[in-house]
Amino acid sequence: MKKVRFWAVLAIGFMSVMSIKAQGQRMNEFQNEFSKYQTQYRELMHSGKHKEAMAPLASCIAMLDTTTIFKVSPIPEAAILEQKGLLYYDYACCYALVGQKKQALAALEQSVLLGYKDYNNMVNDNDLRSLRKDKKYQALLAQVNDRQPLSVLKKSAPYAKDAARQDILFRYQPKESKNLRMVRDYFKLDSVAGQGDELSKIINLLHFAHDNIRHDGGNQAFAELDAIDLYNYYKTTGKGVNCRQLAISLCEMYLSMGIPARYVTCMPADSLDYECHVINTVWSEQLQKWLYIDPTMDAWVTDENGTMLSIAEVRERLINDQPLVLCETANWNHESQQTKEYYLETYMAKNLYYFVCKKLNRFNPESLYRNNDPADDVRLIPVGFVNNNWKCDTTTDPEVFWAKPKKEQ
């Protein structure tokens, strides 16, 4: 059981909000008390005192039952309830470890009712091994299996033509604009891209961004959102940038080389899941299609014949159980290799439910400090999908959303 990770999710969430929003004394008091119980729980579990570890668990659940902290913070009430489900899962493990099977199953049922969805953890968790032959456990496991990202993606509704949104137009800043010339010259991208064909240039630029700007999903870089500032932020502080900032950086590099590109926010179906991933879609004149490019993982995807695929094609092939080949270079910060089973079939399957892009793709698209109005967003969603977390122009038409880039006149 990944107890430390489950507890850390809530604690880190509150700490992040406090550091950014400085919500005041009440937030501090809540986090300090929660951290106290967290420490007690970890120490008791580490020493094998499973029965005693249930007391701090109960205290944390009671805190979540009575708190109204969500009213003074950006944390939604539903997210707090989801975290309570994780605590009930830990409760189930404690009961199972002390031989109280009935109570363990009741706690596990409560966890599943609150939305627990980590199937791989549940099926492999040795803390629950005494429950595995029980019919109730098996029924709960089946419910959790239905929540697996690939299962959810396969049940998504289809897309549909959208005659009302044919006016949506994506634009790409010309490479000779002053700021993009600055990006190209600063990074010496003509040399980085090399003298090979278009696909080799696209991949070389991907490797360059991945190798020279570290990823840190938990860090919101204190910098302007452009490739030069983000690169210098990392080089100066040693702190990585998040996936959105990394994808913005690579998008500017492609645009500066005259290669149409967007950064794409890949979103999950679950409105309570605030974890998403941001990658790039890059236009290939050579293949006459968009390509799936992920600078966080130094990744692209091909079919069984070695042809590079688009984001739309990766999504479709996941749904239809068609072959997908993850490139051999796929890795996180050169520290952990990525596998198709986890990266594509689990992580990206969760985050390929719907997509958001900017209409205007340019240098510094989301300025924090400059007088630079943000471009409008566009969503691509399946028919009938309802999620108000991202309010912007919306279409169900993939031909509109993934339209071939038009050359600037």
What do these predicted regions represent?
Residues 25-28, 63-81:
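Flexible helix-coil transition and linker loops at the boundaries of alpha-helical arrays
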Residues 319-409:
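Low-complexity, Gly/Ser/Thr/Pro-rich intrinsically disordered linker/tail segments
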Residues 248-322:
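Hydrophobic/aromatic-rich core segments of domains that either
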Residues 1-27:
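Bacterial Sec-dependent N-terminal signal peptides
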Residues 156-241:
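Secondary-structure boundary elements
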